Amino acid sequence: MGGGERYNIPDPQSRNASKNQQQHNRQKTKDQNSQMKIVHKKKERGHGYNPSAVQNGGKTKSLSNNSNWNASLSSPSLLFKSQASQNYAGAKFSEPPSPSVLPKPPSHWVHVSLNPSDKETMTFQLKTLLKVQV
């Protein structure tokens, strides 16, 4: 109850002035951001300022490049020919791995004295469990 709290009561005119200033600053920031976005988009598209294009009356020399590009696209098999000739060294997932590659189970997991019929049953059960539904 001792020290009373002090409240700063702002002058209503200065409050309105600061609001107007804030709005003005926000508008400036928005304008600057929109200009930056436009410049950035132009750079992404590759339409930056080109003085030679202005001198040529807006005509660019990209027409000769486009004809080369279209010629290479007319035969897409040429694009993928080098990739198709390369062999993939990894495992093919459509084929099951060979048993020699698979790790051996610990000796305490499998009872050593199994009958051949029990082995066949276990093999069949394991294969049905490991089958991948396509």
UniProtKB/Swiss-Prot annotation:
Keyword vocabulary terms for this entry: Activator, Cytoplasm, Nonsense-mediated mRNA decay, Nucleus, Transcription, Transcription regulation
Cellular component per GO?
A: Golgi apparatus; nucleoplasm; nucleus; P-body
Primary place of residence?
nucleus
Q: Does the keyword Transcription regulation apply?
A: yes
Q: Where is the composition biased (Low complexity)?
A: 62-74
Q: Which parts of the sequence are annotated with region: Disordered?
A: 1-74
Q: Where is the composition biased (Polar residues)?
A: 11-24, 52-61
Q: Name one GO biological process term.
A: nuclear-transcribed mRNA catabolic process, nonsense-mediated decay
Q: Where in the cell is it found?
A: Nucleus; Cytoplasm, P-body
Keyword Ligase attributed? no
At which positions is motif SH3-binding?
94-100
* The protein's role, per its UniProt record: Involved in nonsense-mediated mRNA decay (NMD) by acting as a bridge between the mRNA decapping complex and the NMD machinery. May act by targeting the NMD machinery to the P-body and recruiting the decapping machinery to aberrant mRNAs. Required for UPF1/RENT1 localization to the P-body. Plays a role in glucocorticoid receptor-mediated mRNA degradation by interacting with the glucocorticoid receptor NR3C1 in a ligand-dependent manner when it is bound to the 5' UTR of target mRNAs and recruiting the RNA helicase UPF1 and the mRNA-decapping enzyme DCP1A, leading to RNA decay.
Give the family per the record. Answer: Belongs to the PNRC family. PNRC2 subfamily.
Q: What is this protein called?
A: Proline-rich nuclear receptor coactivator 2
Q: Which organism is it from?
A: Rattus norvegicus (Rat)
